[in-house]
């Protein structure tokens, strides 16, 4: 079967890999000149199944109101009349209940843990390298009142069987020795030892090369203008340089997926939630993080990637804007500078933004559509890197008519 994949980010490329390994002819189409040049380019670098949680949770509406007035706010909303934004926000608020949170988190953890296992398997099989580390994630609490609220998180971790360590300040410094130099107080932390880190851009490009060796063809620098249907099937994809046809089609275009699906009558509830990152060259390795640290106060991740520190996070709801406000950069500088002072040269840091494809319930949309040969693998939000290998594996099974190794029925678009 010839499968045409739209999107060469980490989701599209992992899907291509598993489809090719299953014996399919695969073509990947993307408007960029290389893989992983949009949302997969400079994300936070964490692979954290244990922290796979929906943003829609009990108490979030009240927290969001407080965040809007903070100087270094983890959430920014730029209001405007965008019906898609309004629908998305209303649907997200509808998921901020205890029952919905449990259901959605269960789906996310299931896929994230399956994905981590597939990543380990892929690494062992191919020897792929991407500045990877397997040294866990530390969720750091600067304030005692935030640490006191971790009991609910621990209950969820216990229920899901996720290993964890509750640490005091000394324990946090033992896990991340660079914190001994912190200019900020440390109340304690929650460490998940089974989490990993790695450079998503390096991984995606390395896997693309391996996929080419399996026969995958990349058609890059092509703007995708439309998905053209004939009856209940997709006939071809229209690009700015001609049509591309196949037997099956997979949409893995992240936040841009709804724009191409809407003319087909498919309302995909995915909306872009903007994130920011800086990548800082390390000047003192002893002061730098060892793995990934999640700064609970600012909702920012600080990750060691080889000789660099990646600092990423925040959430801005502002449509498809790609501007880079200095205030967002200042927040990232403050986070890493206060916890790991003099570890990196902030004057040489690169500043980046990406549009995360978020669903109202936090769970990606993976599976078939009402068109017999059109499939979706999108809407992973902040967890595209964490869920990539698992998502690629299950969609390859679904397209190939095989039963996936995990339950995927509740990931399909018909849940909406």
Curated annotation (Swiss-Prot):
Gene label: dadA
Enzyme class: oxidoreductase
Keyword annotations: FAD, Flavoprotein, Oxidoreductase
EC number: 1.4.99.-
Domain of life: Bacteria
One example of a Gene Ontology biological process annotation: D-alanine catabolic process
Organism expressing this protein natively: Rhizorhabdus wittichii (strain DSM 6014 / CCUG 31198 / JCM 15750 / NBRC 105917 / EY 4224 / RW1) (Sphingomonas wittichii)
Biological pathway: Amino-acid degradation; D-alanine degradation; NH(3) and pyruvate from D-alanine: step 1/1
Entry keyword Nucleotidyltransferase: no
Annotated catalysed reactions: a D-alpha-amino acid + A + H2O = a 2-oxocarboxylate + AH2 + NH4(+)
Family: Belongs to the DadA oxidoreductase family.
Residues annotated as transmembrane: none
GO molecular function: D-amino-acid dehydrogenase activity
Gene Ontology, cellular component aspect: cytoplasm; plasma membrane
Known cofactor(s): FAD
UniProt binding sites for FAD: 3-17
Function: Oxidative deamination of D-amino acids.
Protein's name in the database: D-amino acid dehydrogenase
């Amino acid at each position: 079967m010839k499968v045409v994949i739209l999107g060469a980010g980490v989701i599209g490329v992992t899907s291509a890999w598993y489809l090719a390994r299953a014996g399919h002819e695969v073509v990947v189409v993307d408007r960029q000149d290389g893989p992983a040049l949009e949302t997969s380019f400079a994300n936070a670098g964490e692979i954290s199944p244990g922290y796979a949680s929906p943003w829609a949770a009990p108490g979030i509406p009240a927290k969001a109101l407080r965040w809007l007035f903070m100087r270094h706010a983890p959430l920014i909303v730029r209001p405007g009349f965008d019906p898609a934004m309004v629908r998305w926000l209303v649907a997200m608020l509808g998921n901020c209940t205890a029952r919905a949170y449990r259901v959605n988190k269960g789906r996310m953890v299931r896929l994230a843990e399956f994905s981590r296992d597939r990543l380990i398997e892929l690494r062992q099989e191919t020897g792929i390298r991407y500045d990877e580390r397997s040294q866990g994630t530390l969720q750091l609490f600067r304030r005692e009142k935030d640490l006191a609220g971790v009991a609910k998180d621990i209950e969820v971790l216990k229920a899901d069987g996720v290993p964890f360590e509750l640490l005091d300040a000394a324990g946090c410094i033992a896990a991340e020795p660079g914190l001994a130099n912190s200019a900020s107080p440390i109340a304690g932390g929650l460490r998940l030892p089974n989490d990993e880190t790695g450079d998503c851009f390096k991984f995606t490009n390395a896997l693309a090369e391996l996929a080419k060796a399996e026969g995958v063809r990349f058609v890059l620098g092509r703007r995708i203008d439309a998905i053209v249907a004939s009856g209940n099937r997709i006939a071809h994809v229209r690009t700015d340089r001609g049509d591309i046809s196949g037997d099956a089609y997979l949409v893995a275009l992240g936040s841009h997926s709804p724009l191409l699906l809407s003319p087909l009558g498919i309302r995909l509830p995915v909306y872009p939630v903007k994130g920011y990152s800086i990548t800082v060259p390390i000047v003192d390795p002893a002061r730098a993080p060892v793995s990934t640290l999640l700064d609970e106060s600012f909702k920012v991740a600080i990750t060691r990637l080889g000789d660099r520190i990646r600092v990423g996070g925040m959430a801005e709801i502002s449509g498809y804007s790609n501007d880079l406000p200095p205030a967002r950069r200042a927040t990232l500088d403050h986070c890493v500078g206060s916890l790991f002072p003099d570890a990196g040269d902030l004057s040489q840091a690169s500043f980046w933004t990406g549009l995360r494809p978020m669903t109202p319930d936090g769970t990606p949309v993976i599976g078939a559509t009402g068109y017999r040969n059109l499939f979706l693998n999108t809407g992973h939000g902040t967890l595209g890197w964490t869920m990539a290998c698992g998502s690629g594996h299950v969609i390859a099974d679904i397209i190939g008519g095989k039963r996936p190794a995990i339950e995927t029925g509740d990931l399909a678009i018909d849940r909406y």
